[in-house]
Amino acid sequence: MMDRRGFLAAGAAAMAGLGAGLAQRARGEDLRAPSPGQLALDDVQSAHLRHISNLAAMPDGEWRHMGSIDPGQEWLDAYRYQLAFMAYTLGLAAYHHLPAATETLRGPFDALIGKMLRREVWAYWRATSQSGPRLDPGLAALREPWTDPVVRENIMYSGHLLAMVAMYRMLFGDTKYDTAGSLTFRYDPIFYGKGPETYAYDHGTLQRRIVEQFAEFHDLGVPCEPNNIFVVCNQYPLLAVRFRDAVDGTEHLDPLLASYRRAWDARGGVIDGRDSVIWSLMVRQQRLIDYPTPDSAWTLGALNCWMPDRVRAVSGRYAKLWLKETAEGTLQIRPPHELHAMATGTPVGPAMPYRSPALGYAALWLSEVGDRERLTALLDHADRFMQPTTEHGGLFYPRVDRSTDAAGRMTYMDPLTGNALLAYARINVIDGMRALYERPWTARPSGPSIVAVTGATLRRAVHRDGGQTIEFDLVADAATAAPIVVGFGALTPGRTWQLTETGRGGRAGDGRSARIPVDARGQARIASAIGAQRYRLEAVG
């Protein structure tokens, strides 16, 4: 498997005039995602969420289990990607499984945004901004460096930051990042430089600067590293603009996406007429890179939001190319030397190692297009051969740099896949991110909500009866004998609220019930060693 630098150096002839181009938003197959709150989280999914919450709660500067094989935050498993995909996983859980309990995930999500602003996450850009002949063949001299990580290029960071902030605002109704200076980058090394550098943004100014750059680069998107526009990295700012439009009642995405579509149609489309998935465009050379790397599974998963019919049309072909069945019946990423030989016709030795998060990208893509059979086989491989580990109740897969075991089975595990992407794939539903894109919340769901839970794991929380009732599932934490404590918010003071144990159908039966006292702020708290799994909170008077 070529690494990203290999893709940049490889190049390919431009493929103008090919393909049907990009489908407009809202076209394609009908959305197939289940109704929010229909599906409860299971033990494994809940453990993934616990791990993400554990990492989000780490002190600033503590990057436990997040160390990358690359020392400069330049590779595909850098902190920025781990933080972003952990946040997106929380977002998927909030939207699809816990729509009546989003507040329970707001703190970890916000903490991930805070970590995204730390210097060790984005300071690589000061050196990267100089470019070089590996990124820009024929470059005569390095550019003057700049520190601001979002003012120009670097969409591989700024696009994810914008998507995180926009998703946070849409899901939790918190406008804190609309405040001037709420997204501030501080660069103040102790031993060098001419003093502190500060670059202040907020949600609105960050989005505005990114949209301006789309126009500056002829509507094809914004470069990641200098001179290279990667298709996948530009999908996340498009998502972000969609989320903000939903909340603000604006329509900024439609003209932006229309221009993006026209620009790429003129070059054959991001999925061209030969069904090649475009990886990147070298700007100055106007060269398209379409090497069929399994890393493009990430691109397909992201494009499913607004061109699902095209993505599904090519997914079967790429699943056969990128995935390989093992003797045990699991699926792994096809070994890099086999992929290279298939793509180029040039055999290479089996020593070519795995070095990208391709397994995680494939899991993300399969979860989004709803290929449950292949996804299950891929996850089964991870569970059998990639050391699933539980720590403080959280499930993750620790980093392993060794490519294969003695039997040739893939054992390579990067921290992006192990901390975030397999969690994302498990918690996602078919068309999961597409559902957020097509049906973003214009406001937080109204009515009562669950705001905190201790002593138990919340598996599902959904509004019923027009938002006036909560139905939720709890499972007591096996490792503790502490009572279950549940905090509620947005309860109407003066009304009588009743909590009832229900059957699996959600209807009150022979289960116990109790009246819940509500304070003047519309909040309530219960503490009980209750043992049932499903409950219903409703106003009865």
Describe each region flagged by the PLM.
Residues 183, 190-205, 209, 213-357:
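Extended ligand-binding clefts on enzyme/binding-domain cores
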Residues 6-25:
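N-terminal export signals
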Residues 29-128:
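Extreme N-terminal leader/anchor segments
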Residues 97-228, 274-276:
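Extended ligand-binding groove/face enriched in aromatic
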Residues 45-49, 53, 87, 102-121, ...:
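Hydrophobic core segments within long, regular secondary-structure runs in both alpha-
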